[in-house]
């Protein structure tokens, strides 16, 4: 585990250095690379915080929607209460997301990681994220991640299921 922390720090530094030297309208923020989801998952919490603060590459929205959740981009934007026209423009221009936008995407990544650990299958985790849940007043887990209390509740549900705690 200790070996992954320096590697994760180097990945964040590379992304930051690359962004500093990347021409305007072109971003190399976290989310554009093939292994970025795994890199982010393995980062230490403060490195994750730094990556969120610097802003993910806007293309991460498309990648999370299509590759991880198997839903249309518009569905994810709506679920996270992100403005479609702004985000689609950022994707087209290869811009970075703001800190707040990146934070909402990171919540999806954090929850998907917990759900994948629980179900031991990323497809089952994605299906769980997209199904109505009685403990969320009939809402889908992905639909409540736009605000902190919703995120906290989804994490609580997954942690209770993982560790066998009864409500």
Q: What is each model feature region?
A:
Residues 1-167:
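Non-transmembrane "mature" sequence context
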């Amino acid at each position: 585990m200790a070996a992954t922390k320096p590697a994760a720090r180097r990945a964040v530094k590379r992304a930051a250095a690359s962004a500093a030297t990347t021409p305007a309208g072109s971003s190399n923020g976290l989310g554009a690379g093939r292994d970025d989801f795994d890199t982010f998952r393995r980062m230490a919490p403060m490195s994750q915080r730094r990556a969120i603060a610097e802003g993910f590459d806007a293309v991460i929205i498309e990648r999370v929607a299509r590759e991880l959740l198997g839903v249309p981009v518009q569905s994810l934007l709506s679920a996270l209460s992100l403005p479609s026209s702004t985000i689609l423009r950022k994707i087209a221009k290869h811009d970075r997301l703001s800190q707040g936008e990146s934070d909402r995407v990171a919540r999806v990544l954090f929850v998907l990681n917990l759900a994948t650990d629980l179900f031991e299958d990323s497809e089952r985790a994605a299906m769980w994220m997209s199904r109505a849940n009685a403990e969320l007043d009939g809402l889908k887990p992905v639909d409540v991640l736009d605000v902190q209390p919703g995120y906290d509740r989804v994490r609580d549900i997954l942690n209770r299921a993982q560790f066998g705690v009864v409500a």
